[in-house]
């Protein structure tokens, strides 16, 4: 097998888009203002003791420096019921949370309603990785809904088929 050796950013984006992933919204309320980012790089099960998850964020992000200051971050793994939420929270214009139902905690974590999984977390460690930060989060609480997750593959959102009972 011969491999393509082109490693420029545009080519890599297309190649990496072939890996299906869930999408997480990482949000908090700081001084009365809702802030958040979305990450298709979100990964669970990094560690069970302590309970750690992780995601990667571009160093050029304008939102991460604000979110980094939150005591607690709400991680919402988006479900098929959250259509359009990812694009809206990732938007650079307007009110990123207009029309999005959210629930907050006393510690400032902010969750997107109707998601498939919610985790309340705090920053455990942050590691420089090229043009990104890899952020490890310690999980302090969790809840699941039973909704099917939204899947990001080939730069498009997909839903899993509903399992049929035999």
What are these regions (language model features)?
Residues 1-166:
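Basic, polyanion-binding surface patches
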């Amino acid at each position: 097998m011969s491999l393509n050796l082109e490693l420029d950013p545009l080519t890599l984006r297309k190649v990496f888009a072939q890996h299906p992933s869930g999408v997480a919204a990482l949000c908090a309320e700081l001084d009365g203002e809702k802030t958040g980012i979305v990450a298709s790089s979100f990964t669970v099960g990094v560690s069970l003791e302590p309970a750690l998850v992780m995601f990667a964020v571009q160093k050029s992000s304008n939102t991460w420096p604000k979110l980094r200051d939150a005591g607690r971050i709400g991680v919402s793994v988006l479900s098929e019921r959250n259509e359009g939420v990812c694009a809206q929270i990732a938007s650079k214009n307007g009110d990123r949370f207009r029309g999005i139902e959210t629930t907050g905690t006393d510690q400032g974590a902010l969750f997107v309603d109707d998601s498939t999984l919610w985790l309340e977390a705090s920053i455990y460690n942050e590691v420089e990785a090229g043009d990104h930060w890899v952020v490890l989060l310690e999980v302090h609480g969790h809840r699941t809904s039973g909704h099917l997750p939204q899947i990001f593959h080939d730069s498009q959102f997909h839903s899993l088929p509903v399992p049929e009972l035999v």
